[in-house]
Structures are given as C-alpha cells and as structure tokens.
C-alpha cells in the first residue's frame, strides 16, 4: 500500500514537472488574439487521467499551475483559467475513457472533452476571466478587443471574441492535445499503470 502511494506521488510529480516545462513551449496561432497561445502542457495531465484516473489528471493540472503562478505576472488569473479549462478537458476525457478503455473510446472521450472544453472556456471567459482581467489587471476591454481585432478582423466586441477567438481556439487546442496523446499514450501507459 505504501509503495503504491509513493509510486503514484512520483508519477504525478514527474507528469506535473513535464507539464510545467511544456507551458513554456508555447506559440502563437495565426488568426487568434496574441494572449491565446497554444502549448501542450495538458498532454501529461491527459495521460495521467487515462492511465491513473481523472482525478490524477486534475492533480497534474493543479500542480503545474501552482508552480507557474509563482513565476508569472498574470495575477494568478491565467493560471486559474488554465487550471479550470485544462481540468475540464482532462477530467471529461478521463471519466468517459474509464468506462471502456479502448482506442475507439479514447477518441470518443477526447472528442467530447474538446467540445465540453470549448463551450466551458467560452462561458468562463465571457463571465469570469475577461472581467477579472479588467478588474484585477486593469486591462480595458477596448484594449483586449483591439488586440484581438488585430489578429482577426471579425472580432469587434466580447461576443465575437468568444465566437471567433476563444471557442475555435479551444477546439483547435483540444484536437492538437488529442492527436499528441494518441501518438504517445500507448508507449507511456505501461509505465504509468504499474
């Protein structure tokens, strides 16, 4: 029992450290606002969710964001957003995958998780995160919209920012995370399951 707990802690630590490092390998995606950067730090959390269970995936999300919050200048808002959206993705995929651990169900679970993540990210940004950035960081909404419009002319207000920025960005992110996880999961799962 004690050995199993220790092994789980080591695995979560390794996956969290990997996720934290992957947060720094981010890049801008054309047609999306500059503050939306794609990184693959949710892949280790998704792998944990599939191999060890959905709550382990959420733990990886939590640990990577706590570490990142200590060295960032987003006032913690970016990390709360990253944790919320990433956790929704990995938990949804993991909980569905647990019912039937096949490649087909992994694909289904990641497709559903991508849609859930995109909708949830849209709602959270509209009602929580964008207003928080305004209030805590002092970013005027006009500046956020202006920066977004520079990347995509269809973005003219908060609703179009969600429709042409936040939602499609998270769909793209979910697809990319899913593809990478499909490529590496089979190789990593034996190590993580035992």
Language model: regions and residue ranges:
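Loop-helix junctions at membrane interfaces
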Residues: 1-194
